[in-house]
Amino acid sequence: MQLQFRSWMLAALTLLVVFLIFADISEIEEEIGNSGGRGTIRSAVNSLHSKSNRAEVVINGSSSPAVVDRSNESIKHNIQPASSKWRHNQTLSLRIRKQILKFLDAEKDISVLKGTLKPGDIIHYIFDRDSTMNVSQNLYELLPRTSPLKNKHFGTCAIVGNSGVLLNSGCGQEIDAHSFVIRCNLAPVQEYARDVGLKTDLVTMNPSVIQRAFEDLVNATWREKLLQRLHSLNGSILWIPAFMARGGKERVEWVNELILKHHVNVRTAYPSLRLLHAVRGYWLTNKVHIKRPTTGLLMYTLATRFCKQIYLYGFWPFPLDQNQNPVKYHYYDSLKYGYTSQASPHTMPLEFKALKSLHEQGALKLTVGQCDGAT
């Protein structure tokens, strides 16, 4: 009788956990829907659930959700100058790596591999799960056979965000000195080299970049501009989230076609279907209540797998710097701040608060001003 009672209790608890998980997923799907998406792919959710062991909280000490006052946040997020003492906390970094491995393995999840798909296979979009795409021949040709980061380990990694706080930072030389440099969304580097550096080992490319930065390739001039940018990568990893939303399908195919037609020397990677929700699951477990992780946070989470020390540059989601000077949203364009909108899928100030906490504990180095030696 006692055994039967325990069995019923276990079954009830299991149902409760499943209900709470799907309630959370429904909430994020509704939020994403407000910004143009529809939801998450079931297979990705199921895969995440199979690995989501609870991790030890090391980011937010409070058990309650972090609340961010957006009135004048840059004042509250002052970080010591680059020249001040910062020491890497190797113990904490290793603990975070082990925690993240309970949710995902960056070596595997960084890209779908050729052996797992074939031309014509049907894939449900992560944010438009009622919509599907067929794996094209071009996409299949560009899928890697093995992970581009298989057995890779680096002493120091730089992750370069795109905030205007990089302007006049003089961080280019310091960034280029790192073992592995990650950049976001094909951001231009040549004309900003003094502040952002030139070295690129991995660069992300959201499909929306083709619309925003290359005018949807409306003519030969814009196609040539994109082609030049791709050629400049010269063997780097080009990380394209191809399976997120239906709206990116044509743009991904355009880029794939250009790469193949012009024999561009890049190593393409297309993140796994479960990656985004696995990353979000890790941060939620650590009480960082993000809606959808930004590219920068995704890259940091992945980098913990293969980087001993991680240095962040250009992560600053506020319109004023620490001295109350105006800061451009991106260092290279005139895009406006949009994270305060209810429709925005991102919670950048909340992410920054978590990263700042990790900086203060020595798990990562966050540079938001001038670099050492900058003049």
Curated annotation (Swiss-Prot):
GO cellular component, one term: Golgi membrane
Taxonomic source organism: Homo sapiens (Human)
Topological relation to the membrane, as annotated: Single-pass type II membrane protein
Similarity section: Belongs to the glycosyltransferase 29 family.
Catalytic activity as recorded in UniProt: [N-acetyl-alpha-D-neuraminosyl-(2->8)](n) + CMP-N-acetyl-beta-neuraminate = [N-acetyl-alpha-D-neuraminosyl-(2->8)](n+1) + CMP + H(+)
Topological domains annotated Lumenal: 24-375
A molecular function (GO) term: nucleotide binding
Disulfide bridge map: 157-307, 171-371
Compartment list: Golgi apparatus membrane; Secreted; Cell membrane
Active site per UniProt: 346
Positions with a binding annotation for CMP-N-acetyl-beta-neuraminate: 162, 185, 294-296, 316, 329-330
Descriptive protein name: Alpha-2,8-sialyltransferase 8B
Cytoplasmic side: 1-6
Taxonomic path: Eukaryota, Metazoa, Chordata, Craniata, Vertebrata
Pfam families with a match to the protein in the record: Glyco_transf_29 (PF00777)
InterPro entries assigned: Glyco_trans_29, Glycosyltr_29_Sialyltrsf, GT29-like_sf, Sialyl_trans
Substitution effect: residue 60 to S: Does not affect autopolysialylation
GO annotation, biological process: carbohydrate metabolic process; ganglioside biosynthetic process; N-glycan processing; nervous system development; neuron projection extension; oligosaccharide metabolic process; positive regulation of neuron apoptotic process; positive regulation of synapse assembly
